[in-house]
Amino acid sequence: MGAQWKVKHKEAAANAKGRTFGKLSKEIMIAARAGADPDMNSRLRLVVEQAKKASMPRETLERAIKKGAGLLGESVNFERLTYEGFAPHRVPVIVECLTDNINRTVSEIRVLFRKGQLGAAGSVSWDFLYQGMIEAVPTAPDADADEAAIEAGAQDCEPGEEGATLFLTEPTDMDAVCKALPQFGFAVQSAQLGYRPKSTVDGLSDEQMAEVEAFLEAIDNHDDVQNVYVGLAG
């Protein structure tokens, strides 16, 4: 895994689609506070690209933008929280949340971490890199990912999912790299800031792996959890 944890099984993944839209809606609403026009709001533009890749219904996307921008007469008050700790078998985990009730979220996340270990700030983040992660697909048969990474200002690139390339950037460079990649034959599908592990835990048995995955799925299923990053090989 070694980065953002994702549901593996088809049935669970199908059930998670609604939760994915809910998480994206929160990100869109927060980004839209700075303006409802994606062309003038780079953060909103990147989240909208993620939403489109996830096949979020247009009506849902547009409502989230309007709500966040205050065009529907509703206030949006979410706070960002980050938790660090360990899943079973000392697998390092970083959990990002967006909540409208900090006390509720803190209490419920602590309960979920009882099968692992909730740590203090910095307890595992020292073993992760905070980076921009851009998924892009080639638009021409001769598009060269390594060359595009250098020319666009990315730190590195590696094969992504379904024929895409994952471009890695400094957090402050992500938007500029997104804008530059089309010049070098790559169309951006999604972009986000997140954590990548410097090292990963491996050698777990099937039974131990099942325990870790059950823990991660329970965390990811929480309504306030946006992203789960894990230092786990495989």
Swiss-Prot record:
Domain of life: Bacteria
One Gene Ontology term, aspect cellular component: cytoplasm
Protein name: Probable transcriptional regulatory protein PSPTO_3162
Organism per entry: Pseudomonas syringae pv. tomato (strain ATCC BAA-871 / DC3000)
GO molecular function: DNA binding
GO terms, biological process: regulation of DNA-templated transcription
Database matches in HAMAP family: Transcrip_reg_TACO1 (MF_00693)
Keyword DNA-binding set for record: yes
Keyword vocabulary terms for this entry: Cytoplasm, DNA-binding, Transcription, Transcription regulation
Gene3D superfamilies: 1.10.10.200, 3.30.70.980
